Amino acid sequence: MSKMKNPRTFEEQTECIVNSLLKDFRTPLSHAANRNLSGADEPCSGEDYSFDVAIIVGRLRILGDQFNGELEASANNIIAVTIGGQAGSTVLNDTVQSLSRTWCTQDPTLVFERAFLAVSVKLLEYVVRKAPNVARQVANYVTGMINGNTAIREFIQGQGGWENLES
């Protein structure tokens, strides 16, 4: 895969990260174990820039794995709405907000924005596995949802940007 220009804006970085998550979730486990994370497969890496999408994706996957709540029914609803051509982005946002609030209620030490990112990642992973035909559309919704949420953006930027986000 050829290298893209380095993502400079928050929006470009988010798009790059979500696209890389999508690719990562679509990669069979046998291939994922053998891939070269620092090589030419990095669509958004660069020699003169500290943005390493493979590290960020790894951290987000770890973060998503921390969510062990029930999301099957919610994810299936997102899939159905997306397939039906309805407002999937609205349903996704409402679902992520609701699941994140529930998780934070169960664990008062959890920061809402961290829960929001974890739930978003976990829902995307579920959609990729259960309905790969709508995964790209849901990934676009996730990108828009993160980019359009001021609190999430400020949380990530407050950490020093995507490259400093800890799992």
From Swiss-Prot:
GO terms for cellular component: cytosol; nucleus. Gene3D superfamilies: Blc2-like (1.10.437.10). It comes from the Eukaryota. InterPro entries: Bcl-2-like_sf, BCL2L15. GO terms for biological process: regulation of apoptotic process. PANTHER family: BCL-2-LIKE PROTEIN 15. This is Bcl-2-like protein 15. It comes from Mus musculus (Mouse).
